């Protein structure tokens, strides 16, 4: 598993390559499903309505899944879309995908996210959807820019899921929570990655490209004893990344983990890890646009943290899209 504990991504070149542990992907599956309940309630109805009313999908919907990993995103999304589907897993190193049985309607393409534009230029965009899960925050800003540009240029709807936001709350509270989290988030930004700002950057870029964008908060909400094994693994991975980023935190991290492990054993530890999904549509119903505008203005009003590590093109798009 990658030191940042963020399985699911396959990137195109060093130093941004992420190694994925299938065990980690399996461990997080239950947390992902629970977290996406808000997407089921808010974003999926809008997506389905758009595909039926605006795109008039009546044949096969082709779904391109970026960084597909084990195919968990397809397993989750496919039964929730009332269309005949053909899936394309676009993965630079699809070792995991090829090692697992796949539905007959699934194609695996060994290529990087930068090839999305070329892939979308082929065939009918009216019958396509781009999606990914747990990917955007481990892309470099250049790769994120390429994904958004491909979606905009080809006017394809997109559903991007489970991107980390950098937020985390742990109960009981400890004074070392924040410095350890700050170091972890800085580690997420290493080597030019978009990190915790990825989902905000993507939303801004897509709005600047004329898309209507809605979001749903999809945090992991974990507690002992039911999630103890996963929480212990998650915290250890995050601490490892924090110490790599700031070796001076080594002693603090070790003591902090021992404290949290004891609280897990006592059944008193709770943790929430921020994630967000976005649905981006090239046009849409007026009701969807109104909801999206209300959400966007609320996000702009409450956003207090600066954006880090953005590519110049995306920075310009953000400036152009703000009211």
Question: How would you label these PLM feature ranges?
Answer:
Residues 2-55:
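Class I SAM-dependent methyltransferase Rossmann-like catalytic core
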Residues 58-69:
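Conserved class I S-adenosyl-L-methionine
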Residues 71-116:
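Class I SAM-dependent methyltransferase SAM/SAH-binding core
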Residues 156-218:
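Conserved catalytic/acceptor-binding region of the Class I
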Residues 290-323:
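Early extracytoplasmic/lumenal segment of secretory-pathway proteins
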């Amino acid at each position: 598993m990658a030191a940042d504990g963020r399985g699911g991504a396959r990137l195109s070149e060093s130093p941004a390559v992420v190694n994925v542990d299938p065990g980690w992907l399996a461990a997080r599956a239950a947390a992902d499903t629970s977290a996406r309940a808000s997407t089921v309630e808010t974003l999926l109805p809008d997506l389905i309505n758009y595909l039926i009313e605006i795109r008039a999908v009546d044949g096969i919907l082709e779904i391109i899944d970026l960084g597909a990993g084990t195919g968990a995103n397809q397993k989750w999304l496919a039964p929730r879309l009332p269309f005949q589907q053909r899936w394309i897993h676009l993965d630079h190193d699809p070792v995991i995908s090829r090692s697992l049985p796949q539905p007959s309607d699934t194609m695996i393409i060994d290529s990087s996210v930068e090839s999305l534009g070329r892939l979308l230029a082929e065939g009918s965009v009216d019958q396509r959807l781009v999606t990914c899960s747990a990917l955007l925050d481990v892309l470099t800003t250049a790769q994120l820019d390429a994904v958004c540009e491909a979606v905009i240029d080809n006017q394809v709807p997109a559903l991007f899921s489970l991107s980390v936001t950098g937020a985390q709350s742990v109960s009981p509270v400890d004074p070392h929570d924040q410095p350890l989290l700050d170091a972890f988030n800085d580690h997420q930004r290493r080597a030019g990655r978009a990190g915790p700002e990825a989902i905000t950057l993507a939303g801004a870029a897509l709005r600047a490209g004329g898309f209507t964008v809605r979001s749903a908060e999809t945090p992991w909400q974990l507690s002992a004893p039911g999630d103890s094994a996963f929480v212990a693994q998650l915290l250890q991975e995050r601490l490892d990344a924090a110490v790599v980023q700031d070796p001076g935190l080594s002693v603090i991290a070790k003591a902090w983990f021992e404290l949290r492990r004891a609280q897990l054993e006592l059944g008193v530890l709770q943790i929430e890890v921020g994630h967000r999904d976005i649905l981006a549509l090239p046009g849409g119903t007026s009701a969807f646009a109104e909801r999206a505008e209300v959400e966007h203005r609320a996000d702009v009003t409450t956003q207090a943290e600066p954006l880090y590590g953005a590519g110049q093109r995306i920075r310009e798009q953000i400036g152009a899209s703000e009211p």
